[in-house]
Regions:
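C-terminal alpha-helical cap/extension of soluble enzyme domains
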Residues: 168-244
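Catalytic cores of alpha/beta
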Residues: 9-19, 66-78, 125-140, 164-166, ...
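Active-site-adjacent beta->alpha loops and helix N-cap segments on the catalytic face
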Residues: 12, 31-52, 70-73, 94-114, ...
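Conserved, mostly hydrophobic/aromatic
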Residues: 17, 82, 109, 121, ...
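Structural motif corresponding to the early beta-alpha repeats
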Residues: 44-83
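Hydrophobic faces of well-ordered beta-strands that scaffold small-molecule active sites
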Residues: 2-8, 25-27, 54-58, 90-92, ...
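N-terminal pre-domain/capping segments
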Residues: 1-25, 30-37
Length: 244
C-alpha cells in the first residue's frame, strides 16, 4: 500500500487522520494561505497523538518563497524547536528571485534539521525548471518533494509527475499532492508510479458559538468566520481503501 500523508491544522485533525488510517501528517497553520508554521503548543500537542509520523511545515508567512535574513533566522529557530519537541520531519522550501531552488538557504535549514527527515514543499511547483530543481534537491540532501507536477492539481500534473518519478530513480521520493481525493488517489498513483500521496481530506465544521456579532470581522469580511476546516476521518478512510 502507498503511504498516505494528510495535511492537518489541529490536534483534532491529526487524530482524525490517524483514525482514518493515514501514516503521516504534515502539521500546518493557516491552511487558507497554503500553510505556515504552527505554534510550539500545537506541535507539542500533536506529538502526543500516537501512531503517526509527524512532519511540520516551516514557512514563516504566506505568499512567495523568497526570504530575507530575518525570515531565514526564524525558520532555523523553528526547526530547532521542532527537534526539541520530538518532531519526525520538517517541510521546507525556498526559491531565488530567478525561480531556482535557493540551495544555500535550504542547506542551512537541512543542517538545522539535524537528522530529521526533510521534505521540500510545493515551492517546487513555482520553480522555473523542475528537472534541474529536482537534481538540486537531491544534491543538497532532501528526502522528499511534495508537488502537483506544476499544475493546478496532481491529476492534471500526472505527466510531469511520472517523469519526475522516473528521473528520481529512487534517489528522492516524489509525493503527488493537490486536489487529491478518494475519487482520484488510486488513479494518480497508477499514472505517476509514485509510492506516496498527500491529501487534505477536509470538511467544513460549524462553530459552536450561539451569539454571533454580525457586521464585525476578524479578517476577510467575505469569509465565514463561524466555520472551519478539519480532517474528515471518513474521507481519509476512503482514500486508504482506494489505494490499498
Amino acid at each position: 500500500m502507498a503511504t498516505l500523508e494528510i495535511c492537518a491544522g489541529s490536534v483534532v485533525s491529526a487524530i482524525a487522520a490517524r483514525d482514518g488510517g493515514a501514516q503521516r501528517i504534515e502539521l500546518c497553520a493557516a491552511l487558507e494561505v497554503g500553510g505556515v508554521t504552527p505554534s510550539a503548543g500545537l506541535i507539542a500537542e500533536a506529538r502526543k497523538v500516537e501512531g503517526l509520523t509527524l512532519n511540520v511545515i516551516i514557512r514563516p508567512r504566506g505568499g512567495d518563497f523568497l526570504y530575507d535574513s530575518y525570515e531565514t533566522a526564524c525558520m532555523e529557530q523553528d526547526i530547532r524547536t521542532c527537534k526539541q519537541l520530538g518532531v519526525d520531519g520538517v517541510v521546507i522550501g525556498a526559491l531565488t528571485a530567478e525561480g531556482d531552488i535557493d540551495t544555500v538557504l535550504c542547506k542551512r535549514l537541512i543542517e538545522a534539521a539535524d537528522g530529521m527527515s526533510v521534505t521540500f514543499h510545493r515551492a517546487f511547483d513555482m520553480c522555473r525548471d523542475p528537472r534541474k530543481a529536482l537534481e538540486d534537491l537531491i544534491e543538497i540532501g532532501c528526502d522528499r518533494v511534495l508537488t502537483s507536477g506544476q499544475a493546478a492539481t496532481a491529476l492534471a500534473g500526472a505527466g510531469l509527475l511520472k517523469e519526475l518519478v522516473e528521473q528520481a530513480d529512487g534517489r528522492i521520493i516524489i509525493m503527488p499532492g493537490c486536489g487529491v481525493s478518494s475519487a482520484n488517489a488510486a488513479e494518480i498513483l497508477k499514472a505517476t508510479g509514485a509510492g506516496e500521496i498527500h491529501a487534505s481530506a477536509r470538511k467544513s465544521v460549524g462553530s459552536g458559538m450561539i451569539f454571533r456579532h454580525s457586521g464585525v470581522s476578524m479578517g476577510n469580511p467575505d469569509s465565514d468566520e463561524y466555520a472551519r476546516k478539519e480532517t474528515d476521518v471518513n474521507e481519509v478512510r476512503a482514500i486508504v481503501e482506494s489505494i490499498s
